[in-house]
Amino acid sequence: MKTTIILILLTHWVYSQNPTSGNNTATLCLGHHAVANGTLVKTITDDQIEVTNATELVQSISIGKICNNSYRVLDGRNCTLIDAMLGDPHCDVFQYENWDLFIERSSASSNCYPYDIPDYASLRSIVASSGTLEFTAEGFTWTGVTQNGRSGACKRGSADSFFSRLNWLTKSGNSYPTLNVTMPNNNNFDKLYIWGIHHPSSNNEQTKLYIQESGRVTVSTKRSQQTIIPNIGSRPWVRGQSGRISIYWTIVKPGDILIINSNGNLVAPRGYFKLRTGKSSVMRSDAPIDTCVSECITPNGSIPNDKPFQNVNKVTYGKCPKYIRQNTLKLATGMRNVPEKQIRGIFGAIAGFIENGWEGMVDGWYGFRYQNSEGTGQAGDLKSTQAAIDQINGKLNRVIERTNEKFHQIEKEFSEVEGRIQDLEKYVEDTKIDLWSYNAELLVALENQHTIDLTDAEMNKLFEKTRRQLRENAEDMGGGCFKIYHKCDNACIGSIRNGTYDHYIYRDEALNNRFQIKGVELKSGYKDWILWISFAISCFLICVVLLGFIMWACQKGNIRCNICI
């Protein structure tokens, strides 16, 4: 019986020795911010990894209207840019206008003599980039012909008229002499001359207007020469006309000379447009124009340019995000998110960063949770938090700087005879978009990987900094926590946080407590052995006592045992 009592007391003494139950130790855990529901981003190593915060990088919608600030936006209304340049009567309001962006509407149409421009896209681009319809008339001398031809297909008011920037020349009497006119460029800028040739609908119309059965127009400079012969024949009727005019253009450099030679069918220039170099453009759009501010315009409307990428439209003007095919790309602006697990008592509540993050941290991304003689508490670490934020801040701006186009992406137009060129251009544009889409995804994945790595590194730096401060005064419990072997009140915890902790002050106390605790602290394996040994001895003693009682009772006659065979 004495042995049993001794073993029971020994077992009770072993389990009563809880090193953390007194006031001479403390527990300190390091952790990081977490949220209940994070955002999934893509990195180089993971297609989906959860972070506490992320920023969308792809602008996918427009504001639905075109802002007239920060650019001069000119609404073409029912006129195309070329009609306004030629002087179509219903476009007279646009003479001498200036613009950064000329908006052509889908409802725009010509309202004069039907024409075509063999190199329409190039002329439209040249005029659009010039940003002005500034026109200067010149004194061309056309001897022996009738000037200012008119047509019922081109009404100015109720009267027959013609394009105001062109001079339709026809016979005078019964003659149309050969014309040979020169015009030098003595200015220091390029001059754009617009001219044309008339294609009559029949031979009868040809001789009626020009006498000769076939005319010819040759326009030359020192650098180029164009000779055009009319194609006589009936065409589909447009505004009462089956004839056509083909419009051509010639640029005369400073010091060069314009020479026009013709014996019929000439639609002559009246002067020149002054070409300017700039970043003006033209865009087809039906979006309304309104008073607002935006640095990026698409046919769908203006879009903000605070994101590096957009998938609203390939055609843009201004300082615009790069067009890509992806609908979404998210840039990590927070750390890896490990939602906090269910609390498992007081020690589970202060589990360290290795196990999970901490929700509800409001004073930093990284911090401390502790338990000491004064209770429990939590505090953020501003220095490590600021170090991480400083490295993440500016990531978005750097991505925008790398990708935003500082120029406009104009529309591409080609005639039917240039179909192969159009196919090639489309292939090149599609390849560029595919390449940029891939580059964008790769760039964001790299940045996300860097963000997660650097935030993890800041957590590790804080842990190592704390370990170096505590030295032998504490023991790494694993999971991001330390057991401090001396009394550490809130002021002591504060000194660890701000880096002023002096381990020499607590060294003797910590060593003494460590030795005392270690002297009586039994490992879980030894405790198990003692339990099994005490259990076995107790069972043996109980059996001995029970057997002795039975034998004693048998001797006294109180118990009789019959054995039958």
UniProtKB/Swiss-Prot annotation:
InterPro entries (alphabetical): Capsid_hemagglutn (IPR008980), Hemagglutn_HA1_a/b_dom_sf (IPR013828), Hemagglutn_influenz_A (IPR000149), Hemagglutn_influenz_A/B (IPR001364)
Compartment(s) where it occurs, according to its Swiss-Prot or TrEMBL record: Virion membrane; Host apical cell membrane
GO biological process, one term: virion attachment to host cell
Positions on the Cytoplasmic side per record topology: 551-565
Cleaved signal peptide residues: 1-16
Positions of the record's site feature: Cleavage: 344-345
Post-translational modification: Palmitoylated. In natural infection, inactive HA is matured into HA1 and HA2 outside the cell by one or more trypsin-like, arginine-specific endoprotease secreted by the bronchial epithelial cells. One identified protease that may be involved in this process is secreted in lungs by club cells.
Record keywords: Clathrin- and caveolin-independent endocytosis of virus by host, Clathrin-mediated endocytosis of virus by host, Disulfide bond, Fusion of virus membrane with host endosomal membrane, Fusion of virus membrane with host membrane, Glycoprotein, Hemagglutinin, Host cell membrane, Host membrane, Host-virus interaction, Lipoprotein, Membrane, Palmitate, Signal, Transmembrane, Transmembrane helix, Viral attachment to host cell, Viral envelope protein, Viral penetration into host cytoplasm, Virion, Virus endocytosis by host, Virus entry into host cell
Residues in the Extracellular compartment per record: 17-529
Glycosylation site list: 23, 37, 53, 68, 78, 180, 300, 498
S-palmitoyl cysteine-type lipidated residues: 554, 561, 564
Disulfide bridge map: 29-481, 67-292, 79-91, 112-154, 296-320, 488-492
Annotated TM spans: 530-550
UniProt main location, coarse: virion
UniProt GO cellular component terms: host cell plasma membrane; membrane; viral envelope; virion membrane
Protein family: Belongs to the influenza viruses hemagglutinin family.
Subunit structure as annotated in this protein's UniProt entry: Homotrimer of disulfide-linked HA1-HA2.
Described function: Binds to sialic acid-containing receptors on the cell surface, bringing about the attachment of the virus particle to the cell. This attachment induces virion internalization of about two third of the virus particles through clathrin-dependent endocytosis and about one third through a clathrin- and caveolin-independent pathway. Plays a major role in the determination of host range restriction and virulence. Class I viral fusion protein. Binds to sialic acid-containing receptors on the cell surface, bringing about the attachment of the virus particle to the cell. This attachment induces virion internalization either through clathrin-dependent endocytosis or through clathrin- and caveolin-independent pathway. Plays a major role in the determination of host range restriction and virulence. Class I viral fusion protein. Responsible for penetration of the virus into the cell cytoplasm by mediating the fusion of the membrane of the endocytosed virus particle with the endosomal membrane.
Identification of the protein by name: Hemagglutinin
UniProt source species: Influenza A virus (strain A/Equine/Kentucky/2/1986 H3N8)
Lineage: Viruses, Riboviria, Orthornavirae, Negarnaviricota, Polyploviricotina
